[in-house]
C-alpha cells in the first residue's frame, strides 16, 4: 500500500502551483489557507478513498473529520502554508494512515526540497528510497527544532521560557515553520531535539511515525504518545535519554496543558 500512497502524494504535489493561488485567513492573519491546500486535499481524499474504500479522514482544511472507521487517513495538504505562500521551500504534503488508533504508515513529501520520506510500522524509514536513522549526538551537541505556537500567542511567554532553558543546554536551535519537515529532518539525523507547545494531529502523525521508525522517539506532556485526534504538546528526540531531559525542562514551566 505504501507505494500507492506515495504515488498519490507525488501526484497531488502538482496542485502546489507556484503562481495564481488564492490566500484567505482562517480566523487570524497568522493562520491562512490557500486554494492549493484545498486542491491538494480534494485530490488526496479521492485517491486515498479509492485505495482503501472503507476508511475515514481527519484533515486540516474545511473541518473534514470522520473517525468512525477502523482505518483513518490523517492529512495535512500543505504543512507550512505560511512558508508556501511566501515561496519558501520548507513546506510539504503529509499523509498518515491509522488503524484502530495506531499509526501504520506515513508519507511526507517536500517537492521543492526534493525529499520524499516514507515509513511503515515496523519496517524502518526512508528518504528518497534510502534508509535513514537518527543521529547519536548528545543533548549538548544537539540541534533543537521549535516554534512559538504562532496561532496561540498567549502561549508565547511560556514557550520562550522553555526554549531559553533548552537552548542553554543544547548546541543551538532552529525554526523552519513546518513541524513535518522538522521531524523528518530529525529522522534523517539533521537535528536531535524538538519541542512544540501545540500541534494538531495532521502536523505530526506521519512525520512522528517516520521519526520513530528511524530510531527516534516522541511523546506528549504526560510522556505518552501524542494524541492523533486532538491538539497535543509534542516533544521529540533522537534518544530516550534526550527526550527525558526535554520533558524535565518543559515540566519545570508547565504541569498541565493550557488548552
Tell me what each language-model feature is:
Residues 96-183, 231-259:
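Acidic beta-strand-loop-alpha-helix segment within the catalytic core
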Residues 1-78, 259:
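N-terminal subdomain of lithium-sensitive/metallo-dependent phosphomonoesterases centered on the IMPase/IPPase/PAP
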Residues 54-56, 172, 192, 217:
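Residue-level detector of anion-binding/catalytic polar loops
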Residues 12-16, 37, 48, 81, ...:
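Residue-level signal for inorganic ion chemistry
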Residues 1-7, 161-167, 183-259:
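Oxyanion/phosphate-interacting regions
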Residues 50, 58, 67-133, 209-212, ...:
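Active-site-adjacent structural elements in enzyme catalytic cores
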Residues 37, 60, 76-79, 83, ...:
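Acidic active-site catalytic centers that drive phospho-/nucleotidyl reactions
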Residues 26, 60, 176-178, 221:
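Conserved beta-strand termini and adjacent loop/short-helix elements that scaffold enzyme active sites
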Amino acid at each position: 500500500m505504501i507505494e500507492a500512497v506515495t504515488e498519490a502524494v507525488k501526484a497531488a504535489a502538482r496542485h502546489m502551483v507556484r503562481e495564481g493561488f488564492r490566500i484567505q485567513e482562517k480566523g487570524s492573519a497568522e493562520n491562512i489557507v490557500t486554494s492549493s491546500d484545498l486542491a491538494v486535499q480534494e485530490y488526496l481524499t479521492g485517491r486515498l478513498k479509492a485505495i482503501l474504500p472503507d476508511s475515514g479522514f481527519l484533515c486540516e482544511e474545511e473541518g473534514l473529520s470522520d473517525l468512525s472507521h477502523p482505518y483513518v487517513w490523517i492529512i495535512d495538504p500543505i504543512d507550512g502554508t505560511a512558508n508556501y505562500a511566501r515561496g519558501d521551500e520548507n513546506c510539504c504534503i503529509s499523509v498518515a494512515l491509522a488503524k484502530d488508533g495506531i499509526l501504520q504508515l506515513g508519507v511526507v513529501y517536500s517537492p521543492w526540497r526534493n525529499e520524499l520520506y516514507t515509513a511503515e510500522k515496523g519496517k524502518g524509514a526512508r528518504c528518497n528510497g534510502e534508509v535513514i536513522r537518527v543521529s547519536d549526538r548528545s543533548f549538548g551537541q544537539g540541534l533543537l527544532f521549535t516554534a512559538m505556537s504562532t496561532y496561540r500567542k498567549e502561549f508565547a511567554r511560556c514557550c520562550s521560557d522553555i526554549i531559553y532553558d533548552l537552548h542553554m543546554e543544547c548546541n543551538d536551535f532552529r525554526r523552519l515553520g513546518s513541524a513535518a519537515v522538522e521531524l523528518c529532518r530529525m529522522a534523517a539525523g539533521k537535528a536531535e531535539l524538538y519541542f512544540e507547545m501545540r500541534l494538531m494531529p495532521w502536523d505530526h502523525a506521519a512525520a512522528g511515525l517516520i521519526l520513530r521508525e528511524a530510531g527516534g522517539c516522541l511523546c506528549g506532556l504526560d510522556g505518552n504518545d501524542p494524541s492523533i485526534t486532538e491538539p497535543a504538546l509534542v516533544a521529540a528526540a533522537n534518544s530516550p535519554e534526550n527526550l527525558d531531559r526535554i520533558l524535565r525542562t518543559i515540566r519545570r514551566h508547565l504541569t498541565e496543558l493550557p488548552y
